[in-house]
Each structure stands twice: as structure tokens, then as C-alpha cells.
């Protein structure tokens, strides 16, 4: 009997808790997953390395360990390798689990560490699609800023020695996610906007893509609607209500691309991130600002949002690149073939030449 594997059998987060104050349930959730006295490792954004922060609410037991990590730069394969090496050398047994508390960068870091604790070699060896062979250890995602969809995706995006690319696998997806809108309090306006626009751009690229299907469309349309409620419409939503809606927009946006793909903005943003270290959210905004030819309606709405919230989108960041830097940036962008195919179709290579990519980068 032949087996038809035409359709992807992709994983979803098996357990999620949502609600104000749900972070307080973390200890009881983890107690059920602890393997004797093997530690839980908490990887936490270092913005919380201060008194009175969420870190004070983390209950450490036995030899649990809290590691602060910076999100000022995109997570790197080398950073993952160091964390894994340190954990394996410090503990005689594998941890009970890894918990990532922060934005997309920290959650991606936690996912990558959970994978590399059970797979040999460097994280760079697994950048790509379905290269992971061994199941990760238990891992939990707790977003403190919403938009990236990292809490629900099957990838963890890393900058490596050659490229910026995710470890895409069925084992990457979190085993548990905690969605507490109260954790979004205190995010700066610019970061709130940039990260939320990552979600909006996910939706546009998914809904306008050639990979679109009913599954992706249903999630993408809901995320798009929620983004408009939060960022564009004049309504009487409280900050707390907006945080809850943005948290669900991020979730739905991530689900939308799980069964399709992103597009031009993400491909080119990866180039900016790899060469210039541009953070993902702001990188997407910089690129999307110039994509009227590909997403006219989406870009028009994006510009209204920028104006409404008085956000400054950086310009001229590619004006002083060396020839080598520009060529590397183009190489990274064009290497993301599934993204271009989703955006432009199977013949995308005839449409998106190196010179076109170069010309677009020079506008930024």
C-alpha cells in the first residue's frame, strides 16, 4: 500500500493556559513534569534581572537554575552551544525541562537549547528543515511580549556562521505555553509596535501567499482582525484588553504560518539581521515599508498604523554597506526559497533577481 505524504502532519502545542495571573500556576504545572530531582532550567530575559520583576515569582526547587540571557541581539548558534555545554557539564543528568521567559528571541533560545541537549554537534548543523533526529527534552514557553508567534511555531530562528535560519522540526514546538496578559505590562511603545507588526506582517504574507489554504486563512484572518483592533481602530479598549487581544493575535498569526509560509519581508529581514544584527521586529518594519509592489493594501494599512502611533522607522541603514556585506545580505535573503515561493510562486527565481533585491535594500 502506498503512503501519501502530500500533506504536512505538523505538531501543535499540546497544552496551553491563558488568563490574567496564569503565570502563578507555573510551579504546579512543572511539578507534574519533574523527573525526580533533575533540575528545571529557566532562561529569562535579562531585563528582568532586577528586584520586583517576574523573576521574583519563579519558585526554584532542588538544584533548579535561573539563567539570564540578553535579547539585545538575535540568538546565535554559538550562544546555544555554550549554554548546552555549560548545562551538560554542571549537571550529571539531563534537566527535567527548559523554560523560556521573554520575547521571541528568548523563547527561540529555550527551544534550541532543549533540542541540542539531546542532539549531538552544533546548533548550526541543524539550521534548516527537519534535520533534528532526536526528540527534545520538555520545554515551556512564556511570552512577555507578543507578536512573533514563537510561542506556537515549529521553528527557533538563530544566526549561525553562514546564515540566519531556523531549526525547523516537529520537536521544536513547545510542550506547554503559559499566556498571561499581565506579563506584557511595561513593554516600551516602540517594542510593542515592532513586535506586534511582526504578527501583522505574518498575516499579510500568509494571506497573500501562494501556499494559502483554508487552515492558514482561518487563523490569519482572525489575527489580522485582532491587529487592526489593537493598532488601528479607534475604540475604548483598555491596555489590559489590548494585551489580551495582542497575545491571541500572536498565537493565531503563528498558527497561520504553521501550515503556509511568510514572504518577502521576512526573507529580506533575515538578511538585515544576519549582516547588521537588526532585530527581527524592527527589521520587518524597515523592509515592509518599501513593499508596496508586493503587498499594496497591507503596506498602506501599515503606514496608517505607523502614523497613528508616531513610530519612527529607521532609514538609510544600508547606505554604507561594503560590497561584501551587500552580497552576503542578498545571499541570505535569496537562500530562503520557501518564503519566496510562497510570495511569488514556483517561478520566483525568474522574478526576484539579485539586482532587484539589491535595489530594494538600497532604499532602506
Regions flagged by a language model, labelled:
Residues 1-97:
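ATP/NTP phosphate-donor binding region
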Residues 11, 303-364:
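C-terminal charged capping/lid subdomain of soluble metabolic enzymes
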Residues 78-85, 92-182:
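Glycine/threonine-rich beta-strand-loop-alpha-helix active-site module
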Residues 147, 254-279, 284:
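Glycine-rich phosphate/pyrophosphate-binding beta-alpha loops
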Residues 155-259:
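Carboxylate- and glycine-rich phosphate/diphosphate-binding segment that chelates Mg2+/Mn2+
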Residues 200-204, 246-254, 268, 288, ...:
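Short alpha-helical scaffolding segments that buttress acidic/His motifs in well-ordered protein cores
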Residues 270-309:
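Catalytic phosphate/nucleotide-handling subdomain of diverse soluble enzymes
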